[in-house]
Amino acid sequence: MTAKKTINRAVRGWCRHLALEACSSLAGLRGQFRGFDDRCCGVQLVLLHRIQPHEERKFEQFIVWLTKNFKVVSYSRAVEIIESRERVEPTVAISFDDGFKDNLKASEILSRHGLSACFFVCPSIIGETCPEKIKKFSFANLRKKDVREFLNWSELEQMKVAGHEIGNHTMAHRCLSDLQKSEFLDQVGGARSELMSRLGDVDHFSWPFGRFIHFKAEWVDDVLQLGHQSCASGVRGVHSPEHERGHDPAFDKTVMRNTVDMAWPLRHSQYFLSYNLLVGK
């Protein structure tokens, strides 16, 4: 990355931070996010990636805030509600992408609070211990430089026994919109087959990178025909009976997920989830 791009990214980051600080502070002053009335309804799927050791306390605070302000359900239950277009109180389900090692600790924190999540993983990197292979995979496929460990099969089994769900995130985290149909089927179908052979049922899929430009709308039906009950993006939104899904009609069979990051100030994540309900009521 050039110095100019680095500076531009830093400037955009600070502008985003300042805008969110202003919005979340103003909303707090107005008391908008201190509880929802009966006009607020809908399901939101939360998307996380990593919980660093120094972020564990903040993650637990976030979980406590969720339980106080939303009905928190399993990922599968949330998908059922979305598909049935059932009108429900503000409801949230939690998911993680990529299968980083620290997801094990996140699952333990969730279990301690009686909650579960769906962890979307890529079989080709599960259990890998070679630093060079991890570095190469992370840089080429995840576009990250600081990853050192991924979950192994034993840990995934442990998480599933604890009540969490394991989802399909393709075999190797390729950008699916760059692939031919046969490669796409290998990435998605191959991953599901391997996950099922190791862990049993795999009901949900999420595509890497998460934006609509990273997937092909005509492949949504293929994902479902392979046996998945849902096909998830990383596009923000709330699912309610009054609103269409996916913002783009071509993706109306997909489910939206709202990215939050424990590296952000907690109030920013709270603002996103609260604002979704207020604009969606």
Label for each model-derived stretch:
Residues 1-94, 100-101, 178-181, 185-281:
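C-terminal active-site subregion of NodB/CE4 polysaccharide deacetylases
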Residues 46-49, 86-92, 111-213:
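Metal-dependent polysaccharide deacetylase catalytic core of the NodB/CE4 family, i.e.
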Residues 61-69, 109-114, 162:
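A short, Lys/Arg-enriched amphipathic alpha-helix followed by its capping loop at the start of a domain
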